[in-house]
């Protein structure tokens, strides 16, 4: 029997330790990512902000639950982490102008863009960094999707990463060069953006 008092107080009926958290989205068509999209990250890297979004991809199969183990590949000696805000698309859209991009956004979640730096930043794979970004388990995500209506200001959210209890990244979405609706509109110029597609919005400063 469910304790109504627990539900009313917003407490979990099932202890958190008794469940396995899955990624909030498990079936999708595309997993598009955006590089160099925080002004602080550009400064950190010593590069100028891009004139247009820098788009790359991961594979949808890279997504794992927020507490699942990341497999460290034996072919890499430099696996790194990047905290990301994630756009969850709610409906099909194609060839949008930037003012229409907001209409296709269902909500947001969070992810880690795990990266093998020695495959991303080298001449391996012909200089393309797909393999450095898209090895198995390289996208822990979730656990929840927050609808856009529930967020007061998407352009003023804290984005942080802790590693073994130490804070490693501390940024804010106010630093985004290209805003979520602009990213959705930009990607829609090239490919059909479907419901439950995902866009990952770059790395914050370390």
Could you describe each region identified by the protein language model?
Residues 1-53, 149, 160:
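N-terminal non-catalytic cap/leader segment that marks the start of a structured domain
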Residues 38, 92-94, 204-206:
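Short, charged beta-turn/beta-strand-edge "cap" motif at the junction between a beta-strand
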Residues 11-15, 41, 117-206:
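Catalytic-pocket segment enriched in acidic/His residues
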Residues 49-66, 81:
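Structural signature of FAD isoalloxazine-binding scaffolds in flavoprotein oxidoreductases
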Residues 21-23, 44-46, 70-79, 84-85, ...:
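A generic local secondary-structure boundary/capping motif
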Residues 89, 96-111:
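RNA pseudouridine synthases
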């Amino acid at each position: 029997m469910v304790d109504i008092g627990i539900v009313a107080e917003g407490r979990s009926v099932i202890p958190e330790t008794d469940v396995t958290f899955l990624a909030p989205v498990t079936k999708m068509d595309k997993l598009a990512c955006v590089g160099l999209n925080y002004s602080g990250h550009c400064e950190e890297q010593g590069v100028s902000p891009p004139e247009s979004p820098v788009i790359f991809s991961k594979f949808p199969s890279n997504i794992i639950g927020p507490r699942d183990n990341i497999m460290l590949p034996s072919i890499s000696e430099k696996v790194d982490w990047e905290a990301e805000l994630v756009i969850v698309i709610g409906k099909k859209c194609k060839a949008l102008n930037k003012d229409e991009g907001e209409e296709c956004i269902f909500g947001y979640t969070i992810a880690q863009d795990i990266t093998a730096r020695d495959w991303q930043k080298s001449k391996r794979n012909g200089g393309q960094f797909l393999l450095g970004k898209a090895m198995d388990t390289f996208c822990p995500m979730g656990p929840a999707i927050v609808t856009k209506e529930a967020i007061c200001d998407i352009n003023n959210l804290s984005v942080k990463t802790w590693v073994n209890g130490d804070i490693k990244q501390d940024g804010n979405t106010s630093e985004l060069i290209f805003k979520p609706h602009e990213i959705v509109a930009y990607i829609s110029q090239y490919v059909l953006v479907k419901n439950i597609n995902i866009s990952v919005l770059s790395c914050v400063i370390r």
